[in-house]
Swiss-Prot record:
SMART domains: S4
Family statement drawn from the similarity comment of this UniProt entry: Belongs to the pseudouridine synthase RsuA family.
Protein name, as recorded: Uncharacterized RNA pseudouridine synthase RT0532
Residues making up the signal peptide according to the UniProt record: none
Gene3D superfamilies, A to Z: Alpha-L RNA-binding motif, Pseudouridine synthase I, catalytic domain, N-terminal subdomain, RNA-binding S4 domain
Keyword vocabulary terms for this entry: Isomerase, RNA-binding
InterPro entries cross-referenced by the UniProt entry: PsdUridine_s_RsuA/RluB/E/F_cat (IPR042092), PsdUridine_synth_cat_dom_sf (IPR020103), PsdUridine_synth_RsuA/RluA (IPR006145), PsdUridine_synth_RsuA/RluB/E/F (IPR000748), PsdUridine_synth_RsuA/RluB_CS (IPR018496), RsuA_PseudoU_synthase (IPR050343), S4_RNA-bd (IPR002942), S4_RNA-bd_sf (IPR036986)
A Pfam family this chain is assigned to: PseudoU_synth_2
Organism: Rickettsia typhi (strain ATCC VR-144 / Wilmington)
Domain of life of the organism encoding this protein: Bacteria
An example molecular function term from Gene Ontology annotations: RNA binding
Domain S4 RNA-binding: 2-69
Length: 242
């Protein structure tokens, strides 16, 4: 038997918390009967309906690495009718993203059919490393020589783990930035605070997973064997260049 909210979350419909709200709001039926308790147990024989749509009630967690191109937003629906990540994912089941990349950022975006798996990756206690390659215009020395930890910008504290200069030329510098908790536009705001303008931002690693040889718009599924190792924290570094 499985908790109803967990099944809805694992089906990729929404997070477990939002699944509980849908249930309490009378949006969920089991075998045609409206259910109001998120703690309700179901099994593989039950037919589950969410807002009028049937879902597969039991499915294994799956995980994909996707190279998000610039110009797409990480949402299922956009009120401004901009192009979204999920409109481009032909051939995948319904998935949700683990975290986000903003419109003008690119690189590694994790996708899953499991709200529980997404929650495991996203919660701060997971302490999963996010690595970015960042190109910026401005004086790199001012950033590197100052203390960029525990910065307070517009009332929000930012605490990047490390910022390392990779290379520079007359106009731009490339940096490697490591975060363990990503806040909205964190890197861009930190760099702007120190007088640098970010003009390219690529996420190349999330936890043990690296972007490898993927090109913008490409995706690949992580094998069940590797996924189990990631979930059990036995895999600290993985790159698949198939």
């Amino acid at each position: 038997m499985y908790r109803l909210a967990k099944i809805i979350s694992n089906a990729g419909v929404c997070s477990r918390r939002n699944a509980e709200k849908l249930i309490v709001g009378g949006k969920v039926k089991i075998d045609g009967i409206t259910i109001l308790s998120p703690a309700t147990n179901v099994d593989i024989s039950n037919q589950i309906e969410v807002s009028g749509r049937l879902i597969n009630n039991i499915q294994k967690p799956r995980l994909w690495i996707y190279y998000k191109p610039i110009g797409l937003i990480t949402t299922h629906k956009d009120p401004l009718s901009r192009k979204t990540v999920f409109e481009q994912l032909i051939g995948l089941p319904r998935v949700i993203s683990i975290g986000r990349l903003d419109l003008n950022s690119e690189g590694l975006l994790l996708l899953t059919n499991s709200g529980d798996l997404a929650h495991q990756f996203e919660m701060p206690s997971s302490k999963l490393k996010r690595v970015y390659n960042v190109r910026a215009y401005g004086n790199a020395n001012f950033l590197l020589k100052n203390n960029y930890n525990n910065l307070k910008i517009d009332g929000i504290f930012y605490n990047p783990y490390s910022i390392k200069l990779l290379r520079q030329n007359k106009n731009n510098s490339w940096f490697e930035v490591v975060l363990f908790e990503g806040k909205n536009r964190e890197i861009r705001r930190i760099f702007e605070y120190f007088g640098l303008k970010v003009n390219k931002l690529i996420r190349v690693q999330y936890g043990a997973l690296k972007i490898g040889n993927l090109k913008p718009g490409d995706y690949k599924e992580i094998s069940n064997k590797i996924l189990k190792k990631i979930i059990s924290n036995k895999l600290t570094n993985y790159i698949d260049n198939r």
